[in-house]
Amino acid sequence: MANLPKEQKLLFQGKVTHVFNAQEYEVTLENGIKLNCHIAGKMKIHHIKIIIGDMVKVEISPYDLSKGRIVYRFK
């Protein structure tokens, strides 16, 4: 996903429904689709914690719509 320009990445909002470990999450998007997501590198560096029920912004590659990357956690 890192090699695509920003215009080609799809951004969605969703809610964290399941935590697998510190870096893997299941997110349900606003349209009801469930994705397996991991957190972005900047969120790892800044130790941003995500728990069940958090609203997040998810970035999805148009080539693989089953996986996503959490790029922002709403306050």
Curated annotation (Swiss-Prot):
Gene3D superfamilies: Nucleic acid-binding proteins. The gene is infA. Component of the 30S ribosomal translation pre-initiation complex which assembles on the 30S ribosome in the order IF-2 and IF-3, IF-1 and N-formylmethionyl-tRNA(fMet); mRNA recruitment can occur at any time during PIC assembly. It comes from the Bacteria. Residues 1-75 form the S1-like domain. Keywords: Cytoplasm, Initiation factor, Protein biosynthesis, RNA-binding, rRNA-binding. The keyword Hydrolase does not apply. This is Translation initiation factor IF-1. HAMAP family: IF_1. SMART domains: S1 (SM00316). It comes from Mesomycoplasma hyopneumoniae (strain 7448) (Mycoplasma hyopneumoniae). GO terms for molecular function: ribosome binding; rRNA binding; translation initiation factor activity. One of the essential components for the initiation of protein synthesis. Stabilizes the binding of IF-2 and IF-3 on the 30S subunit to which N-formylmethionyl-tRNA(fMet) subsequently binds. Helps modulate mRNA selection, yielding the 30S pre-initiation complex (PIC). Upon addition of the 50S ribosomal subunit IF-1, IF-2 and IF-3 are released leaving the mature 70S translation initiation complex. One of its GO terms (cellular component) is cytosol. SUPFAM superfamilies: Nucleic acid-binding proteins. Its main location: cytoplasm. Belongs to the IF-1 family. It is found in: Cytoplasm. Pfam families: eIF-1a.
